[in-house]
Amino acid sequence: MNRFNGLCKVCSERRYRQITIRRGKDGFGFTICCDSPVRVQAVDSGGPAERAGLQQLDTVLQLNERPVEHWKCVELAHEIRSCPSEIILLVWRVVPQIKPGPDGGVLRRASCKSTHDLLSPPNKREKNCTHGAPVRPEQRHSCHLVCDSSDGLLLGGWERYTEVGKRSGQHTLPALSRTTTPTDPNYIILAPLNPGSQLLRPVYQEDTIPEEPGTTTKGKSYTGLGKKSRLMKTVQTMKGHSNYQDCSALRPHIPHSSYGTYVTLAPKVLVFPVFVQPLDLCNPARTLLLSEELLLYEGRNKTSQVTLFAYSDLLLFTKEEEPGRCDVLRNPLYLQSVKLQEGSSEDLKFCVLYLAEKAECLFTLEAHSQEQKKRVCWCLSENIAKQQQLAAPPTERKMFETEADEKEMPLVEGKGPGAEEPAPSKNPSPGQELPPGQDLPPSKDPSPSQELPAGQDLPPSKDPSPSQELPAGQDLPPSKDPSPSQELPVGQDLPPRKDSSGQEAAPGPESPSSEDIATCPKPPQSPETSTSKDSPPGQGSSPTTELPSCQGLPAGQESTSQDPLLSQEPPVIPESSASVQKRLPSQESPSSLGSLPEKDLAEQTISSGEPPVATGAVLPASRPNFVIPEVRLDNAYSQLDGAHGGSSGEDEDAEEGEEGGEGEEDEEDDTSDDNYGDRSEAKRSSLIETGQGAEGGFSLRVQNSLRRRTHSEGSLLQESRGPCFASDTTLHCSDGEGATSTWAIPSPRTLKKELGRNGGSMHHLSLFFTGHRKMSGTDLTECDEASRKRKSKNIAKDMKNKLAIFRRRNESPGAQPASKTDKTTKSFKPTSEEALKWSESLEKLLLHKYGLEVFQAFLRTEFSEENLEFWLACEDFKKVKSQSKMAAKAKKIFAEFIAIQACKEVNLDSYTREHTKENLQSITRGCFDLAQKRIFGLMEKDSYPRFLRSDLYLDLINQKKMSPPL
């Protein structure tokens, strides 16, 4: 092998290995982990990779002579899968250095200590690894290889073994950290280094747990009989860092709160499957507080025994298959994003709620005793509150929310710049009511007695610093030197503002609406600001996330707020010749400008007690534009009455009068688009979210959770995944590429008025949808007359179909279905008693014809209708009798629902997918049985309970008995 990157031939052969691996029947026989660079996680015994010489912990630098050192693990995995026959890897091998141990054993320590060394130039690496000063503890992330004369070489995936207890002479090492199952390489194990390194605290102190009112039961000492109760803490073996490295002594990590006394406990081994991301369980900020054996409800009557590990910031659900060995069941639940429902004091059940795919899911757990439930709930509620106080409330902006929906703090007359802010209290009240749209108060420890009253304002600052924060939705004070480049996009909230003492002010109460003032939105937070919650936004974040000051808002101007749940009417913002505004899809187009109707202005004046702000307010002109699919108006519709800054109230009334005559047809089928933006449906409005576009602009894009399907990454088997697959970590990178357009789509209301202007001929309407053809004036007139005479009926029908995209769809959960299929099922509408039977089981729901239709309509709102479609396709497949038709239908079902990157791919694990693929070699009626059972179980555990709680189902079981038809 020649030289690589300046190393001599000897060093190159020691450190770099070029390995050719041929594909076997089960893939290449190894798994990978980590990002930038990617490392070999495990090598199958006897597989192609092991025969070729690949070893665990090898760092992949090149794949087929392409540099991949900075690739992500998912990207490299897809690239390896796409290689048909063989791959050529250039790897950097960790070469052990032999060093005598304390008792004559051999301690092998990796010469390349960290990812920091791997990213440095090879010549620097060689120097640093052999002769340089020892690397700082915070740079040591690599795995150490420890060899003892009796125990042999130990090598684990994410384990950090080291030399422990040199002074005391301890050299006890755990068994080889590989799963005991001989054929399953998809597990890695995190084992404690020393059997005495975990402690059990079995009981809470009786005088520390608050007793519930009305209960006479005292907290009894429950000493863990039958392994039901385990309150644990981990002794952290660390010295300046969170790994098992270079620790000469053991020191315990004292918890923040005491749940009981210390009792020794045999160590437990946590087994992480490959689909679960391993955790740094030795992080000094992460303390194991509690371990309890509970019952987890997997169905209505099906339970399983699980072991819950409660850390200071997350929960781990595990199952103890063997004594002392816990398999992790799923990804961890972080306490800052979960909620606890304790239920009644007599019931032993309690629930843990979390968000998945923007929908609320829950785990139902059952304790073995009241004491155990009280202990677990006390620990969880205490730490959930602690973590959520540190976390900023997430910002969720909807598709049709407008600038007027921002929370604004009203200013009070007589308040000057010298007004003082109330100091927030440090003791939160448990029963405090939070403002709408927020899960936590923005202040650190607010109390209800010190919230800002209605009408009290924060003093305007002449020159606010970029790191200052304002309460959610409040206008920023005017700045002395505003610049157009400081403008931020509409539709994002402001983070809470901190005063000079470092505490945040509480948000203002809800107040009446003022839709003529645009508020200053909040810039998107960078990962640095989202992870470091305690530091102000100005620190540790990129310059683009700093909060600039807003311009164009006088300090003494009255501003009010509107509750976004009550009304989302898009504001009509006047426009001057010197300023061009960016609009949301529900706002007015550049060709139709006007102020609010007089009725809305009158209501606003009455409710707020102040006259509305003048419509001549000028807003800045340099906001980035949304990128929206273009539906342009033809030039024939741009014949306005001259360019003017804003239309008068009389013009608005005249246009309203025109609409009154034209709106009769729209009222026939309850699909009027006048109030298109007034609806607050979370499912509809959350389909689109804003994201960074090219050249600093902002674009509308489909939410990541809707575009992505979950894939099992169990092994590197050959699957034809498309090169454009976007993983969880790389999905956002594909949105900001390409050129952007600066044209903004008009609102449906504006479009309706625009199409009705200037006569509103059918030809004008058809040109809008069929495109503009440039012709001379004479030819255009002749074609107009001819087309009107020949195709008026066809065009009218076509127009009605195409204009339907701008009408409000009647998709609310409690509304009556409107499609043809739903109309045919109206005659089968069940009674309340029949609908109540659907709650007994999912089978009874699917056997009922109307129930099947209703459940399918509900799944469409949940964006998971492919699960039911797959189940129904499998049922139809079992009814096919012809073998040839059965083979064709089986391939169609596999390609449509099971194949990776299929158009309606269902969520199956890799084993089920491979098993179904093998069944297609010899097609029978039961070749989809396993996949069908998995999807049925998924619907039964996930979608079916949500359906029973939905408004659609509740309306059916609570429907009033109608009088019989005549």
Curated annotation (Swiss-Prot):
Phosphorylated by cyclic GMP-dependent protein kinase. ISGylated. One of its GO terms (cellular component) is plasma membrane. Residues 527-548, 576-594 have a biased composition (Polar residues). One of its GO terms (biological process) is negative regulation of signal transduction. Residues 841-966 form the RGS domain. The modification Phosphoserine is found at residues 712, 715, 747, 776. It is a peripheral membrane protein. Residues 649-675 have a biased composition (Acidic residues). Residues 115-135, 403-618, 637-704, 806-830 are annotated as: Disordered. It comes from the Eukaryota. Detected in embryos from E8.5-16.5 in cortical ventricular zone, dorsal root ganglia and cerebellar primordia. Isoform 3 is detected in testis and in spermatocytes from newborn mice. Levels increase and reach a maximum after 21 days; after this they decrease again. Long isoforms are widely expressed. It is found in: Cytoplasm; Cell membrane. Residues 676-686, 820-830 have a biased composition (Basic and acidic residues). CDD domains: PDZ_RGS3-like, RGS_RGS3. GO terms for molecular function: GTPase activator activity. Residues 18-95 form the PDZ domain. The modification Omega-N-methylarginine is found at residue 167. Keywords: Cell membrane, Cytoplasm, Membrane, Methylation, Nucleus, Phosphoprotein, Signal transduction inhibitor, Ubl conjugation. The keyword Nucleotide-binding does not apply. Binds the GNB1-GNG2 heterodimer. Binds EFNB1 and EFNB2. Down-regulates signaling from heterotrimeric G-proteins by increasing the GTPase activity of the alpha subunits, thereby driving them into their inactive GDP-bound form. Down-regulates G-protein-mediated release of inositol phosphates and activation of MAP kinases. This is Regulator of G-protein signaling 3.
